[in-house]
Amino acid sequence: MAVPKLDELLIGKKMEPRYMEYNWRDIALYALAVGAKKKDLMYTYEKYLKAIPTYGTIPYWGTVNVKPYQWMPLPASMLADEIIKPTIAFLNMDHEIIWHKPVDPIKGTFQWQDEIVDVYDRGEGKGAVVKTKVLVRDEAGQAVCTNYSTTFFHEAGGFGGKPMPKSDVVIPDRDPDYCEDDYVTETQNLLYRLTGDTNLIHVDPEYAKNMKFDEPIIQGLCSFGFSCRMLVGYLIPGEPERAARMAAQMSSPLLPGTPVQLQVWKSDDHKAYFRFMNKNTGKAVLNRGVFEWK
């Protein structure tokens, strides 16, 4: 049976436009979902409110204001899943967000359109990787941020496509310049779920076991948001609006109720590298991370 040319099938496909409305409560809920503490009133109290920059990742799954676990319409990664079927599972490999302007923390509307921008072939039996782009605009049509992410499909390789490029991020071979400990609570996945990522692997024990996990796991973009909050606190304290770009590989699953550590290496005046570590296992949850600011 011939293997379909996934690059020809998928590259350039765009989804229907989507939108979501939000207000200060959604901004504060997101902050709590990514670990904001009592001292972080800047993210949780409307008197001082600023948005944690990674609130701009919420449209990637985009299930806010719709029925749980239903995308209306499908985001690009899910469309790829529909075309590639039959497939057992797909896995997010990395995420990148570029900020064009700060997120309005009081209220606003996000509008966006998902697009498949590239497909990589890891070889027969090794899977394929689909890269998607989500440009998020506000109600006036101004660009707020651009999300890029890659999704791995286990059974889809061997169609003769180009290989996936290697990351150009190299963590310095020295001790970190800064470390900060934190804790992902036993209900962190449930709290983050309320921000829009209703994938069953993060809530349903039976579903998680079917996917070879002992229990539901923390959302990758929750770890991404945790890291962003901590990076802002160290590198640009009190000024989240200065964030320019953040990217990281999703390297290993994280269970609720786990101590974590952010490790940071400064590169220059406006760039740093980071890892987000599981302190129980010593493994990187997020690796090859980079954070840039204005």
Regions found by a protein language model. Name each.
Residues 2-15, 90-180, 250, 254-257, ...:
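HotDog/MaoC-like acyl-thioester-processing domains
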Residues 206-283:
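Catalytic-pocket segment enriched in acidic/His residues
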Residues 43, 126, 238-242:
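Short, surface-exposed helix-loop/turn micro-motifs enriched in polar/charged residues
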Residues 19, 40, 49, 55, ...:
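Generic secondary-structure boundary/loop-capping signal
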Residues 1-109:
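Hydrophobic, proline/glycine-rich low-complexity stretches
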Residues 2-48, 167-223, 230-233:
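A contiguous, surface-exposed recognition patch within enzymatic or periplasmic domains that forms
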Residues 8-9, 68-78, 90-93, 109-115, ...:
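A short linear-motif detector with a strong N-terminal bias
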